[in-house]
From Swiss-Prot:
Domain comment, as recorded: Three calcium ions are usually bound at the interface of each cadherin domain and rigidify the connections, imparting a strong curvature to the full-length ectodomain.
Taxonomic placement: Eukaryota, Metazoa, Chordata, Craniata, Vertebrata
Residues bearing attached sugar chains per UniProt: N427, N560, N683
Main location: membrane
GO BP terms, alphabetized: adherens junction organization; calcium-dependent cell-cell adhesion via plasma membrane cell adhesion molecules; cell migration; cell morphogenesis; cell-cell adhesion mediated by cadherin; cell-cell junction assembly; homophilic cell adhesion via plasma membrane adhesion molecules
Any one of the GO CC terms: catenin complex
Record bears the keyword Metal-binding: yes
Gene3D superfamilies: Cadherins (2.60.40.60), TCF3-CBD (Catenin binding domain) (4.10.900.10)
Any one GO MF annotation of this record: beta-catenin binding
Leader sequence residues: 1-26
Protein name in the entry: Blastomere cadherin
Physiological role: Cadherins are calcium-dependent cell adhesion proteins. They preferentially interact with themselves in a homophilic manner in connecting cells; cadherins may thus contribute to the sorting of heterogeneous cell types.
Record-annotated membrane-spanning stretches: 707-730
Residue ranges annotated as propeptide in the record: 27-157
Length: 884
């Protein structure tokens, strides 16, 4: 060790210091420039036994507090030990020491809240030499690899490797030693040390290193707890040949926090609200701040809140308070008035070290919300209005109020009430936009009854007042304006019974109307507004209603024996008033309709016919209807029989003898209960059938219904259309005869280009596709311009697969074609385009290129007509041509 280390940690100085601490428990002197903390970062207490009893004193730690207060709060990292207020370290319960040293930490806080820690090592001197024990009491801690155990021997569980604590932001010098790693195998051979893990060979790399031979572990630069709170490394020990001599030992380096970060508010501006008029102690809002420093093991991250400024400072400077721990802002004063001060801005401070450290400032804006502490007041408080009579829903007056509360809130919204509203003639509502009261008429006012109304209206808010306030009242004087009112029928609805046999001009009723304008003398005139059947007449002057003699209870205009007419009455005022009334006539029935049977046409079989049931109806009502009586007349009783049923509402009609097929007319005489008789002719058709006849079959065969006739005609028309389409199709399918030869001026672009012109015949060049196509494409038909000579069809040789035989193929097929009289003129082997006169290739000898020595005479082609002229020119010719 160098002289500096001996000077800093002499064992004699340490023993003297401990004795001094025992004699002088506290020094009540405040030294200027004092640095608080433990006097040493590491303490080693040696014992000479493995087991330590409870209450045994191990040693003492010294804390420099730089104040006159007595310090007494320590935090021990091992629950088996405790520290007295004066720094004495005692055994709290029975402890058994093993081969490893027992290590733990002791922490405390100074007056500013800064945490300080020191490392404690309890060493059993039986496992250390005397020199090592003396060295450990004054040097940096030494970590020894635990002993290996083989076999089934159980490992000791109380071997604890204390963490190495390093303060962040240390100034150095660097590299700085932290701890020495030792192995007991150094006694046997040379040991080399290394470390791996976080901060060594894994990111962040290079922070820690170890001297290979001495085992001193070093830190190379200042640490930052906000980046990494701790580092976990593994120490290794190997021999000279690279073999591991110890199991890897885990080392934890804990970074001790320093107060190097200011608090930060979580928002630039905090906003809250509180209602005016609330009681002190009401919670308003909260602010919050964060600090990256440690708030668990130190006060570096413990934040305290305070209010620095209130703007405005009205009505008192300190209206609000803040909880220094939680940041909750509450109201502590009274006098909040939104109408005067709608908003407060607080400047708040967050300070770490529980209020004694670094600070940050923020803003808290508190909005004062409205309370219903202002009553609405009428402005003005008296109104006059003129209202025409008989108007319902007429807007009488709009009433205005003034309310100092916040517009649009329930504390501002006005609610109007009519204090006295006799008869319910008026109604008042609130305009949601302007907050005005709208006074309207709920019923029509009558000038003749009352000419003026005085109304008192009160106003409040939609929510109750937060404080006792007076209620404002307004007075509205309403004057009724006289207008010409329409006359009124008395009664409005008149009901009269009248017989349907009312004679023309006979009085039905005298209608009466009254004019509400009693102070005016006006003439009334009566009219009929709506008379659907035009049965009535009214006297314009006196309102007497008479009939025109056409009333009919059985008319379609009469519903449920009643006939309704709308009556009108007018006055001669300005403007003319028109009143409406209703006249309901209850039409009394008379026996003016006789009973009739139904149906009046039916069919019946000639064999065992079923009786025909006829229903009897009468347009009248009882007692002018049933019971009915029936009889037959005009000779119908000779062949037919009529009987009533038990109820007397229907009859059965049946023949008395077998009837022949045909149509019969039956005269049925019916009478009602009042002997009103009605003769009706019923037509019966007798069919050849037996039993019940629905329709006569002869009718079905002889005659057809219109739909059946239309279907038949449609089918015939469709058949004709299909026949015409078929004929057109067959006509289009006829073969059109094409000309055998092309016209003279019709040229074909089938010119074969010869490589040399005028160089003589080249009859060895063959276009095999043309030859093959010319033979195979012959139409399979007989000539129709001359009578053909019946000959056998020539046999053409198929094209050989061997190219060497192509010459024989051409000669044989050419000879067969020359001897084929059935071949048409256009079935030539080659077709050449006309190249004009004077062509150097005017003579093409393909026709004479056959190897056959037989000569053919084609002059007969000239006798076949103009169509074969070109072919005769090609194959025929005179002797001069042959010589050429």
């Amino acid at each position: 060790m160098g002289g500096t280390d001996k000077f800093r940690y002499p064992s004699v100085w340490l023993c003297g210091l401990l004795c001094l601490l025992q004699v002088v428990p506290s020094i009540n002197v405040d030294v200027s420039g004092c640095q608080p903390g433990f006097s040493s970062a590491n303490y080693t207490f040696s014992v000479n036994r493995r087991e330590l009893e409870r209450g045994r004193k191990l040693g003492k730690v010294n804390l420099v507090d730089c104040t006159t207060r007595k310090h007494g709060l320590y935090d021990v990292g091992d629950s088996r030990f405790r520290v007295l207020p004066d720094g004495t370290v005692l055994v709290k319960r029975h402890v058994k020491l093993h081969s490893k040293d027992t290590r733990f930490t002791i922490s405390t806080w100074d007056a500013r809240g800064i945490k300080h820690s020191t490392n404690i090592s309890v060493v059993n001197k039986r496992h250390r030499s005397g020199e090592e024990a003396r060295s450990r009491s004054s040097e940096l801690p030494v970590l020894t690899f635990p002993e290996k155990h083989t076999g089934l021997k159980r490992k000791k569980r109380d071997w604890v490797i204390p963490p190495i604590k390093v303060s962040e932001n240390e100034r150095g010098p660097f590299p700085k030693r932290l701890v020495q790693i030792k192995s007991n195998k150094e006694k046997l051979s040379k040991v080399f040390y290394s470390i791996t893990g976080q901060g060594a060979d894994t990111p962040p790399e290079g922070i820690f290193r170890i001297e290979k031979e001495t085992g001193w572990m070093q830190v190379t630069r200042p640490l930052d707890r906000e980046e990494y709170e701790k580092y976990v490394l593994l120490s290794h020990a190997v021999s000279e040949n690279g073999a591991s001599v110890e199991e890897p030992m885990e080392i934890t380096v804990t970074v001790i926090d320093q107060n190097d970060n200011r608090p930060k508010f979580t928002q630039p501006v905090f906003r809250g609200s509180v209602r005016e008029g609330v009681q002190p102690g009401t919670k308003v809002m909260s602010v919050s701040a964060t600090d990256d420093d440690d708030s668990i093991d130190s006060l570096n991250g413990v934040i305290a809140y305070s209010i620095l400024k209130q703007d405005p400072e009205e009505p008192i400077p300190n209206l609000f308070t803040i909880n220094r721990e939680t940041g909750v802002i509450s109201l502590i004063g009274t006098g909040l008035d939104r109408e005067k001060f709608p908003e407060y801005t607080l400047t708040v401070q967050a300070a770490d070290l529980d209020g004694a450290g670094l600070t940050a400032e923020g803003k808290a804006v508190i909005e004062i919300t409205d309370a219903n502490d202002n009553a609405p007041i009428f402005d003005p408080k008296t109104y006059t209005a003129l209202v025409p009579e008989n108007e319902v829903g007429f807007e009488v007056q709009r009433l205005s109020v003034t309310d100092l509360d916040m517009p649009g809130t329930a504390a501002w919204q006005a609610v109007y009430k009519i204090r006295v509203n006799e008869g319910g003639f008026f109604n008042i509502t609130t305009d949601p936009e302007s907050n005005q009261g709208i006074l309207t008429t709920a019923k029509g006012l009558d000038f003749e009854v009352r000419k003026q109304y005085v109304i008192q209206i009160t106003v409040e808010n939609a929510v109750p007042f937060s404080v006792p306030l007076p209620t404002s009242t307004a007075t509205v004087t309403v004057t009724v304006e006289d207008v010409n009112e329409a006359p009124v029928f008395v009664p409005v609805v008149s009901r009269v019974d009248v017989s349907e046999d009312l004679t023309r001009g006979e009085k039905i009723v005298s209608l009466v109307a009254q004019d509400p304008d009693k102070q005016q003398i006006q003439k009334l005139s009566y009219f009929i507004g709506n008379d659907p059947a035009r049965w009535l007449t009214i006297n314009k002057d006196n309102g007497i209603v008479t009939g025109n003699g056409n009333l009919d209870r059985e008319s379609e205009y009469v519903k449920n024996n009643t006939y309704t007419v709308i009556m009108l009455v007018t006055d001669d005022g300005v403007p003319v008033g028109t009143g409406t009334g209703t006249l309901i006539l209850h039409v009394l029935d008379i026996n003016d309709n006789g009973p009739v049977p139904s149906p009046r046409v039916f069919t019946m079989c000639d064999q065992n016919p079923e009786p025909q049931v006829l229903t009897i109806t009468d347009a009248d009502i009882p007692p002018n209807t049933y019971p009915y009586s029936v009889s037959l007349s005009h000779g119908s009783e000779l062949t037919w029989k009529a009987e009533l049923d038990s109820k007397g509402t229907s009859m059965r009609l049946s023949p008395t003898q077998q009837l022949k097929k045909g149509d019969y007319s039956i005269y049925v005489l019916l009478a009602d209960a009042q002997a009103n008789r009605q003769l009706t002719v019923v037509n019966a058709t007798v069919c050849i059938c037996e039993g019940k006849a629905i329709k006569c079959q002869e009718k079905l065969v002889a005659g057809f219904d219109l739909p059946i006739i239309l279907v038949i005609l449609g089918s015939i028309l469709a058949l004709l259309i299909l026949s015409l389409l078929l004929l057109l199709f067959l006509k289009r399918k006829k073969v059109v005869k094409e000309p055998l030869l092309l016209p003279e001026d019709d040229t074909r672009d089938n010119i074969f280009y010869y490589g040399e012109e005028g160089g003589g015949e080249e009859d060895q060049d063959y276009d095999l596709s043309q030859l093959h196509r010319g033979l195979d494409a012959r139409p399979d038909i007989m000539r129709n311009d001359v009578v053909p000579t019946l000959m056998s069809v020539p046999h053409y040789r198929p094209r050989p697969s061997n190219p060497d035989e192509i010459g024989n193929f051409i000669d044989e097929n050419l000879d067969a074609a020359d001897n084929d009289p059935t071949a048409p003129p256009y079935d030539s082997l080659l077709v050449f385009d006309y190249e004009g006169s004077g062509s150097e290739a005017a003579s093409l000898s393909s026709l004479n290129s056959s190897n056959s020595n037989n000569e053919h005479d084609y002059n007969y082609l000239n006798d076949w007509g103009p169509r074969f002229r070109k072919l005769a020119d090609m194959y025929g010719g005179d002797d001069d041509d042959d010589e050429e």
